[in-house]
Amino acid sequence: MTAESAPPPPPQPETLAAVKEERGEAAAAGAGVPAEAAGRGAGGRRRKRPLQRGKPPYSYIALIAMAIAHAPERRLTLGGIYKFITERFPFYRDNPKKWQNSIRHNLTLNDCFLKIPREAGRPGKGNYWALDPNAEDMFESGSFLRRRKRFKRSDLSTYPAYMHDAAAAAAAAAAAIFPGAVPAARPAYPGAVYAGYAPPLAAPPPVYYPAASPGPCRVFGLVPERPLSPDLGPAPSAAGGSCAFAAAAGAAGTGSFQPAVCTGARPVNPAAYAAAYAGPDGAYPQGASSALFAAAAGRLAGPASPPAGGGSGGVEATVDFYGRTSPGQFGAALGPCYNPGGQLGAGGGGAYHSRHATAYPGAVDRFVSAM
């Protein structure tokens, strides 16, 4: 192998760099681009977006705060904020309207701005925007060049001038949907929007049943819809689990009563119920006279006067305060079914069935066994 056929030596690095630079200059000259710009674009990083000429050095939050601070009422609509910015800074007037989206986003996403609903009689449309009173010191000494810190509202209850009462609004909304289901303890909404709603109904008084007293007997009838007479009082229970029924006084003001005691056996599965006529403190009301009140009967039936000896033929006259015929008037014919007091079953007293009292408190006895 001779020296003439040997491969040429590799070029030096300086020679390669010079060749590349010459080629880049030739390409830039052909395209009309300066060589300095071509070299910076090829080897350097991407340039940042150039600053727009004439753009004010204020953030969008600062622009909004300036507009609200210059308003006579210290509040502006969205259109009023746009107008202030375009009149004060020509940059936003001549450029596209993309900045308006940023204004809207900053209004809704920052806690330092409060939305105030427009009054009913005020013309125009749109809500008002105001600066939170606790956020007025966000900018140092009135300078809006830079925000000092992000404002975060922690307690909404400290701004009663701008925030509605959530509880009252919820009560008014519930009254609109269910007019009779508003609790009595919650007052009506004082605002003009909900002024047409009726005041809430009074809640029923609590029911109280002494554990030591025997339960009420099973009765034939429904809970009366008429109010009870104010002259009725509580009926004392007889010993041994017997039932005491109401009896009307023979004469007004006599204060006497004649309890009738159940003597037969009670049904096997009594579905007793209790008619709730309790006072505010949970006890049964005490009337002016001593006439008895049958607590669980739901209707009143009792002997108006002592039975005449043999004159009535075994039929006992009863008093029904609700204009209905009591089964007690047919005691002779329905001897095994009804007792003289007008109650279903000839049974005597027994313990109150706790399971039915728990499952059906204050309900009507709908489970009457077939005769």
UniProtKB/Swiss-Prot annotation:
GO terms for biological process: cell migration; chordate pharynx development; cranial skeletal system development; embryonic organ morphogenesis; hair follicle morphogenesis; hard palate development; positive regulation of DNA-templated transcription; regulation of transcription by RNA polymerase II. One of its GO terms (molecular function) is DNA-binding transcription factor activity, RNA polymerase II-specific. Its main location: nucleus. Disulfide bonds: none annotated. Phosphorylated. Residues 55-149 bind DNA. Disruption phenotype: Knockout mice die before hair formation. They exhibit cleft palate and either a sublingual or completely absent thyroid gland and show neonatal hypothyroidism. Keywords: DNA-binding, Nucleus, Phosphoprotein, Transcription, Transcription regulation. It is found in: Nucleus. Expressed in Rathke pouch, in thyroid, and in the epithelium of the pharyngeal wall and arches, whereas it is absent in the epithelium of the pharyngeal pouches. Residues 43-52 have a biased composition (Basic residues). InterPro entries: Fork_head_dom, FOX_domain-containing, TF_fork_head_CS_1, TF_fork_head_CS_2, WH-like_DNA-bd_sf, WH_DNA-bd_sf. PROSITE patterns: FORK_HEAD_1, FORK_HEAD_2, FORK_HEAD_3. Residues 21-53 are annotated as: Disordered. Residues 26-39 have a biased composition (Low complexity). GO terms for cellular component: nucleus. Transcription factor that binds consensus sites on a variety of gene promoters and activate their transcription. Involved in proper palate formation, most probably through the expression of MSX1 and TGFB3 genes which are direct targets of this transcription factor. Also implicated in thyroid gland morphogenesis. May indirectly play a role in cell growth and migration through the regulation of WNT5A expression. This is Forkhead box protein E1. It comes from Mus musculus (Mouse).
